[in-house]
Amino acid sequence: LISEKESRYEREYSSHLYSESEKSAINIKEVYPKYSNETKLVDGREIINKYFFELFENNPKVFAVGEDVGMIGGVNQGFAGIQEKFGKYRITDTGIRESSIIGQGIGSALRGLRPIVEIQYLDYVYWALQTLSDDLSTLQYRTRGGQKAPVIIRTRGHRLEGIWHSGSPMGTLINSLRGIHILVPRNFVESVGMYNTLLSSDEPGIIIEPLNSYRLKENLPTNLSEIKVEFGCPSILREGSDISIVTYGSMCKIVMDSAEQLQAVGISCEVIDVRTLLPFDKNDTILNSLKKTNRIVFADEDVSGGASAYMMQNVLEKQNGYYFLDSKPITIHSKDHRPAYSLSLIHISEPTRPG
């Protein structure tokens, strides 16, 4: 009887936090990037810029607003040349008012448009948190799916550029914004796939582009407009047998470099990129890795008790991963203070690879 009541109340009072329609982002399947024999190696910023040109050309409902996105093409040039080609009504500079930027996105999305609203750096999301939390993340829930505002919030963060430009407050976002997809790409091909998935859905999401990857080289796919990332499906970046290391975003490169160093001394690491924090690992990919290695580390750039603790709870408690442990699970995270500006001192504040 108790079980039946719990099931009924779950449906009555906990439904519609996320979309339950056929266009729910969770239903959209992976479409992998394709490469030709003449594939170019380009900066990450060139990939996202080329994608935005194709997107604005092909989808007249898409427009963008944010600080410096128009005239100068964004602080990292992702929108370079877009305003010149498509005009000020399609991509518009705003004042320094993050809450207002989000509000513009909510209103236009409710009217059927597909806004990309830019918060210049992840640290500045705090100034829009009340609007994101009270208005956007609750919209489908409090209207029982009756209203939808599929806003895409574009921002950047994690490593680089000191106290105000390199924050990684992922725990804050995870705990405040249930109802919004929290997406943490490791590179710009992944970012493109996440934009396409959101644009194919009827839900909002926040994409946190890796700040230190705009000038890192990537292969340019031939099918940018088609790539999709399946939310809740981690990627195994490196197979191993001794320990599972779970991470995301900018930390993927750090962990991969560290795994290479550990391999040299006989330690085989399996490296897993979660890709999306909300939703998190819907197919138990991390649990299956833990069953093989029996040891696990969760690594990120948030403070202690942040996203690393969230990932640990999901794997050990919700997926019952504790049963397969042969040693204590570990979290690797940043210090509880803000990061230093000097790159030579970043190892004091944030996780870095040895050497």
Predicted regions and their residues:
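Thiamine diphosphate
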Residues: 3-213
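Glycine-/acidic-rich phosphate or pyrophosphate-binding loops and their flanking alpha/beta elements
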Residues: 47-55, 168, 189-205, 213-264, ...
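Generic long, charged, amphipathic alpha-helical segments
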Residues: 268-289
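Single conserved hydrophobic/aromatic residue that forms the stacking wall/gate
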Residues: 346-355
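Short helix-loop-beta junction
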Residues: 81-88, 172-177, 254-272
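Catalytic-face loop-and-helix region of soluble metabolic enzyme cores
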Residues: 300, 308-331
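Short helix-capping segments at alpha-helix termini
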Residues: 143, 262-267, 318-325
